[in-house]
């Protein structure tokens, strides 16, 4: 009887821990571009926006098969996104 009870407790613990880990695993789009509403139609395609949380990349909208989506594009190591130039630049971008 104790064998089944121990296995049941371990099974429940694994389910709880697993569900918490999947909740913590956010995609880059969810982390840095959550604010950008590409489906609302107010954002022009090809327009870029700075990512949040000090990310060294930018957010943009795309469209595939008639569906609009948000995507995060990281800059190369040592680069930051320049709002003025609308691209990743070497060093720290000027605001």
From Swiss-Prot:
Signal peptide start and end residues: 1-25
Keyword Signal: yes
Keywords recorded for this protein, A-Z: Signal
Tissue: Female saliva (at protein level). Salivary gland (at protein level). Not detected in abdomen tissues.
Extra facts: Ameliorates clinical signs and immunological parameters in an experimental mouse model of inflammatory bowel disease induced by dextran sodium sulfate (DSS).
Described purpose of this protein according to its UniProt entry: Reduces production of nitric oxide and cytokines, such as IL6, IL12B and CCL2, by stimulated host macrophages. Does not affect production of TNF-alpha/TNF and expression of the cell surface molecules CD40, CD80 and CD86 in host macrophages. Does not affect mitogen-induced host T-lymphocyte proliferation or lipopolysaccharides-induced host dendritic cell maturation.
Protein known as: Aedes-specific modulatory peptide
Gene transcribed to yield this protein: SG7.8AP
């Amino acid at each position: 009887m104790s064998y089944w009870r121990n296995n049941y407790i371990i099974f429940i613990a694994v389910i709880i821990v697993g569900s918490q880990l999947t909740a913590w695993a956010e995609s880059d789009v969810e982390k840095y571009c959550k604010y950008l509403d590409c489906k609302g139609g107010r954002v022009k395609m090809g327009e870029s926006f700075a990512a949040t949380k000090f990310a060294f990349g930018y957010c943009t909208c795309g469209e595939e098969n008639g569906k609009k989506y948000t995507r995060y594009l990281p800059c190369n190591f040592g680069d930051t996104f320049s709002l003025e130039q609308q691209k990743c630049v070497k060093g720290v971008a000027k605001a």
